[in-house]
From Swiss-Prot:
GO terms for biological process: carbohydrate metabolic process; cell division; cell wall organization; peptidoglycan biosynthetic process; peptidoglycan turnover; regulation of cell shape. Belongs to the glycosyl hydrolase 3 family. NagZ subfamily. Keywords: Cell cycle, Cell division, Cell shape, Cell wall biogenesis/degradation, Cytoplasm, Glycosidase, Hydrolase, Peptidoglycan synthesis. The lineage of its organism: Bacteria, Pseudomonadati, Pseudomonadota, Gammaproteobacteria, Chromatiales. This is Beta-hexosaminidase.
Length: 348
């Protein structure tokens, strides 16, 4: 059975009978988890085991676990600082900053994999230019080359733990002020301006064969009239064509306000797939899932080949064994030595 094109959210900490039925639909390919789905590492493992047991090959299980404001699982997990704390370290000592980024990526990935989560939508490849509050300290740095350097460390840490990385939000969300969860951002710059700035990390990481990319719900109005998620130009011509990207392309959540440009939820899902996405996310609208499934295409063998590469391959798949590792203990100590993360949670 191939992985379908929809990644859907769940309502609680256990699967309902209705969710079990939906997750067996051939056009479903994955689940994205949030803090509402989490109580403890033990409960999380029971949930992921139940999801993975439904199908063969198993459904993908993902989460946004970046650190700082975007860390869905907290109780029992290492509290990761926001990636932006690495900017000051990088400015003093790039090698130390990359080593810390590697630690953060490895620690995040190891803990998730030990609980049965396949991958995190990370790292953020946007520039932290002080323009976008929703990106803010989720970004590594304001300078493209620094973002590339630090992101490569983070991705290598994830890979060492057995997790595939997914960069976001292509082709760059850090230079627009509006929050795409609430409204549709519009970037007025010419393509040449993006080439020397926001596009640099995506171009470089695409060349590194990053396994996954997530698109931005942003219109780059001097370049293309559609948000990147629904744009054949951005996904087909630029990402696949110019950048030669061969990994899986994910839409950002289709329930966000910025995605309304494409119409009702079923139409949004279809438009994102027609633009070139391999999988679309519907995180917070369970009532819309049946209609969305009716509008989605059947699973595609090429997309399936891209998506199955995101299944977790944990080096350590047991929570207690992980905590006994000297490497885990030392990584926790180094990461906790960084600046404290801001309180609160950003729902993205």
């Amino acid at each position: 059975m191939l992985l379908g094109p929809l990644m859907m959210g769940l309502e609680g900490t256990r699967l309902s009978s209705e969710e079990r039925t939906l997750l067996c639909h051939p056009r479903v390919g994955g689940v994205i988890l949030f803090s509402r789905n989490f109580q403890s590492p033990e409960q999380l493992r029971a949930l992921t085991d139940a999801i993975h047991a439904l199908r063969r090959p198993p459904l993908l299980i993902a989460v946004d676990q970046e650190g700082g404001r975007v860390q869905r699982f907290r109780e029992g997990f290492t509290r990761l600082p926001a990636p932006g704390v690495l900017a000051a370290v990088y400015d003093r000592d790039p090698a130390q900053a990359r080593a810390l980024s590697h630690d953060m990526g490895w620690l995040m990935a190891s803990e998730l994999l030990a609980c049965g989560v396949d991958f995190s939508f990370a790292p953020v490849l946007d520039l932290g230019r002080g323009v976008s509050r929703v990106i803010g300290d989720r970004a590594f740095h304001s300078r493209p080359e620094a973002v590339v350097h630090l992101a490569r460390g983070w991705v290598a840490g994830m890979r060492d733990a057995g997790m595939a990385a997914v960069g976001k939000h292509f082709p760059g969300h850090g230079s627009v002020a509006p929050d795409s969860h609430l409204e549709l951002p519009r970037d007025p710059r010419a393509r040449s301006a993006l080439e020397g700035a926001d596009l640099v990390p995506f171009r470089r990481l695409a060349g590194d064969r990053l396994p996954g990319m997530m698109t931005a719900h942003v219109i780059y109005q001097a370049i293309d009239p559609l948000p990147a998620t629904f744009s054949g130009y951005w996904i087909g011509e630029v990402l696949r064509g110019e950048l030669g990207y061969e990994g899986a392309v994910f839409s950002d959540d289709l329930g966000m306000a910025a995605a309304a440009e494409a119409g009702p939820l079923p139409r949004r899902a279809r438009a994102a797939m027609e633009a070139g996405c391999d999988m679309v996310l519907l995180c917070n609208h369970p009532e819309a899932v049946p209609a969305v499934l009716r509008h989605l295409p059947d699973p595609d063998p090429v997309s399936d080949m891209r998506l199955v590469r995101l299944h977790g391959r944990p080096v350590v798949d047991n929570w207690r064994k992980l905590h006994r590792l000297t490497r885990w203990q030392e990584a926790v100590r180094r990461v906790r030595g960084q600046d404290p993360s801001p309180e609160g949670e950003l729902e993205v």
